[in-house]
């Protein structure tokens, strides 16, 4: 069995790490490189960086900090933000990223997933999916341009259908960003994760809602996700990664303990 992964998420805006609640009202957390170093030293398995306004601004992620991060950490990291072409992805990988993640650009042009997978291999192509639970219809819907609350909009895709589609097109991993839970720290949406796990045959990463060590355990044990991504609990030092991994290991979760 592959070890489960703990993945700090760093949302980047104007060259700094920020964090919002339900993708709104972002506050500045700190500088990119020192935070990346801290998480690597604490025992993170991987880091994810989202340049959250790149797609909505019509630009590609700023590559200058990508190379700086690559110089100071020795764990894999994934970068997302406005990657619309094979060439965009190639530059970010050349600057030192191990994976690239696409979200809104994949919704605009689903063939991009296949072109990236064909060129660089499925192992480094991640598709991020921003999913919103609508109580009225009791359904999960995919949103795009979520980095800018003024431009955020619903798509015509139901989350389940989009998960199936991106796998057919060559996604090597899926990060499910559960918008309702984002930043509120009351637990991952286990119902949604369990439902999507049944149709997701590539690694599935849970994102949105972690507030306690028990929440990570529930995601791994009850929904069988491959990794758990979190931001605010790590940024605000509510949870220490090393202590979290020790707890998970004691609970029987297969995980790399530092």
Curated annotation (Swiss-Prot):
GO annotations of cellular component type: cytoplasm
Annotated EC: 4.3.2.10
Active site: 11, 130
Keyword annotations: Amino-acid biosynthesis, Cytoplasm, Histidine biosynthesis, Lyase
Membrane-crossing residue ranges in chain numbering: none
Domain of life: Bacteria
Annotated pathway: Amino-acid biosynthesis; L-histidine biosynthesis; L-histidine from 5-phospho-alpha-D-ribose 1-diphosphate: step 5/9
Signal peptide: none
UniProt-listed SUPFAM superfamilies: Ribulose-phoshate binding barrel
Enzyme class, broadest EC rank: lyase
InterPro entries recorded: Aldolase_TIM, His_biosynth, HisF, IGPS_HisA/HisF, RibuloseP-bd_barrel
Keyword Amino-acid biosynthesis: yes
Catalytic activity: 5-[(5-phospho-1-deoxy-D-ribulos-1-ylimino)methylamino]-1-(5-phospho-beta-D-ribosyl)imidazole-4-carboxamide + L-glutamine = D-erythro-1-(imidazol-4-yl)glycerol 3-phosphate + 5-amino-1-(5-phospho-beta-D-ribosyl)imidazole-4-carboxamide + L-glutamate + H(+)
Coiled coil: none
Main location: cytoplasm
Compartment(s) of residence: Cytoplasm
Function of the molecule: IGPS catalyzes the conversion of PRFAR and glutamine to IGP, AICAR and glutamate. The HisF subunit catalyzes the cyclization activity that produces IGP and AICAR from PRFAR using the ammonia provided by the HisH subunit.
Quaternary structure annotation from Swiss-Prot or TrEMBL: Heterodimer of HisH and HisF.
Family: Belongs to the HisA/HisF family.
Annotated protein name in UniProt: Imidazole glycerol phosphate synthase subunit HisF
Annotated organism of origin: Yersinia enterocolitica serotype O:8 / biotype 1B (strain NCTC 13174 / 8081)
